[in-house]
Swiss-Prot record:
Domain of life per record: Bacteria
Protein name: 3-dehydroquinate synthase
Keywords noted in UniProt: Amino-acid biosynthesis, Aromatic amino acid biosynthesis, Cobalt, Cytoplasm, Lyase, Metal-binding, NAD, Nucleotide-binding, Zinc
Lineage: Bacteria, Pseudomonadati, Pseudomonadota, Gammaproteobacteria, Enterobacterales
Native source species: Yersinia pestis
Described purpose of this protein according to its UniProt entry: Catalyzes the conversion of 3-deoxy-D-arabino-heptulosonate 7-phosphate (DAHP) to dehydroquinate (DHQ).
Length: 362
């Protein structure tokens, strides 16, 4: 069992990583006998895990209600979040309730935002079931829903009480979803840790084969890296946390333009990271050899290195200008300067951004 702490003073919380955590109600601390829970999941995961997890929690003396949401990025919306509020109010649940988010990034982000809003804030626990949510979205307290004009535009910084990562969930993950999660894994190596990027080059096949030892190390290292960044810059005030958005400015444009769910988040981020790498190369920062290393590893992970053929470079910019890193109308980009190093760069000419996107057209 691996344990990591996200250090945020009185709001610090543990991340627990192991296979079989769902079998023990003690895994879900700070829950205790007598507590009331609203378990939030989706229609895909409910048949796989809901009954067994509910039984384990009830065996621990916890009172459990549930709400099952539709599955997909297109349902990460205010209207779907209202279903959670309705379920809470119908029972009813008070301020002493705990929301448990059983699912990937959509369920986790939506449930976390619902917890931040319900009666001005109730406790919630992240139980991520996808690789992407285990290494990224469940950690750090970013909660949100989408708007038709932009991804994650309505949300709050709201930290969970704990994160419970059961590696066995990855055994039921479709290969496309596994690859999507690997995009965020590779991101950590590009922006923060050259040695981890080297490790990924040597172990990507083991991760794709669901080698539990490799997965445990991979998830732990990603969570360590993110926990350190979140502890230093919880609300993206110093710029350190914004580095975690490598590829996202371009990638969110793909998701919004194509329609949420057509491209998985990790697929869009993968293409976006190559676009960012090409931008950095054009600025004379990133070497051609490092661009090729990034592309090669993404391809080995089963990820795209080009944007959608339907999207002209010019169609990216309106979405990119709605990015949360834009300041005073100036586009600011996270760019890799070498494997393991990155920076936030403002003032990049739009023509150069468009040329870099064109570099990545199929």
């Amino acid at each position: 069992m691996e344990k990591i702490t996200v250090t945020l003073g009185e709001r610090s919380y543990p991340i627990t990583i192991a296979a079989g955590l769902f079998n023990d109600p003690a895994s879900f601390k700070p829950l205790k006998a007598g507590d009331q829970v609203m378990l939030v999941t989706n229609q895909t995961l409910a048949p796989l895990y809901l009954d067994s997890l509910r039984a384990v929690l009830e065996h621990g003396g916890i009172k459990v209600d549930q709400v099952i949401l539709p599955d997909g990025e297109q349902y990460k919306s205010l209207s779907v979040m209202e279903q959670v509020f309705s379920a809470l109010l119908e029972k009813p649940h008070g301020r002493d309730t705990t929301l448990v988010a059983l699912g990937g990034g959509v369920v986790g982000d939506l449930t976390g935002f619902a917890a931040a809003c319900y009666q001005r804030g109730v406790r919630f626990i992240q139980v991520p079931t996808t690789l992407l949510s285990q290494v990224d979205s469940s950690v750090g307290g970013k909660t949100a829903v989408n708007h038709p004009l932009g991804k994650n535009m309505i949300g709050a910084f709201y930290q969970p009480a704990s994160v419970v990562v059961d590696l066995n969930c990855l055994k039921t993950l479709p290969p496309r979803e596994l690859a999507s999660g690997l995009a965020e894994v590779i991101k950590y190596g590009i922006i923060l840790d050259a040695a981890f990027f080297d490790w990924l080059e040597n172990n990507i096949d083991a991760l794709l084969a669901l080698d539990m030892s490799a997965l445990a190390y991979c998830i732990r290292r990603c969570c360590e890296l993110k926990a350190d960044v979140v502890a230093a810059d919880e609300r993206e005030e110093s710029g350190a946390r914004a580095l975690l958005n490598l590829g996202h400015t371009y990638g969110h444009a793909i998701e919004a333009e194509m329609g949420y769910g057509v491209w998985l988040h990790g697929e869009a981020v993968a293409a976006g990271m190559v676009m960012a790498a090409q931008t950095s190369r054009r600025l004379g920062q990133l070497s051609v050899s490092d661009v090729e290393r990034i592309k090669k590893l993404l391809l080995r992970a089963g990820l795209p290195v080009c944007g959608p053929k339907e999207m002209a470079p010019e169609s990216y910019l309106p979405h990119m200008m709605r990015d949360k890193k834009v300041l005073a109308g100036e586009l600011r980009l996270v760019l890799p300067t070498a494997i393991g190093k990155s920076e936030i760069r403002g003032g990049v000419a739009h023509d150069m951004v468009l040329a870099s996107i064109a570099d990545c057209r199929p």
